[in-house]
């Protein structure tokens, strides 16, 4: 089990393979470098909550926006980096998953994040394969993990678009 804190993943994957587990309360992962990515394989266990305080309060995963995530092919931008969750036991992911220029693929047979008080996902592209069940809870008040500004519950003074 990880100790509370910030973990920097630089120039390589954060991989949890078959039979492996990644467990931690009050942990944040900062992904930096062109080859940093998440890969949670089948038969792995992932149970994480984001930090309560500090610079990454509420952020479970943060991908550095300066990472090279796209390449040009005949003038078009193509995503070259993707994060994959195939785990059959990634039931608790409390916090914000911030991958603004990356693709997130959920490709498992069991529910993902269904036991979380809340999960926010921010990604450039999002893909669900093989009938996975991604559950994005929004019970923000049930958690002491803060919700970063700009995501989560709307405040009365927030700007809203109405039809």
Predicted regions and their residues:
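Long, polar low-complexity repeats
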Residues: 1-135
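Low-complexity, S/T/G/P-rich flexible repeat/linker segments used as non-globular hinges
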Residues: 119-163
């Amino acid at each position: 089990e990880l100790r509370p804190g910030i973990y920097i993943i630089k120039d390589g994957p954060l991989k949890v393979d078959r039979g492996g587990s990644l467990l931690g309360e009050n942990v944040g992962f900062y992904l930096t470098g062109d080859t940093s990515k998440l890969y949670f394989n089948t038969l792995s266990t992932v149970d994480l909550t984001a930090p309560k305080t500090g610079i990454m309060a509420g952020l479970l995963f943060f991908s550095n926006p300066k990472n090279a995530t796209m390449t040009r092919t005949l003038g078009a931008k193509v995503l070259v980096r993707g994060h994959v969750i195939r785990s059959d036991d990634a039931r608790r992911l409390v916090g914000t998953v911030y991958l603004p220029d990356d693709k997130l693929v959920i490709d498992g047979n069991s529910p993902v994040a269904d036991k979380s008080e809340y999960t926010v996902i921010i990604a450039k592209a999002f893909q669900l394969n093989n009938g996975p069940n991604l559950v994005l809870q929004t019970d923000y008040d049930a958690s002491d993990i803060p919700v970063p500004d700009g995501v989560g519950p709307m405040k009365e003074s927030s700007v809203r678009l109405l039809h």
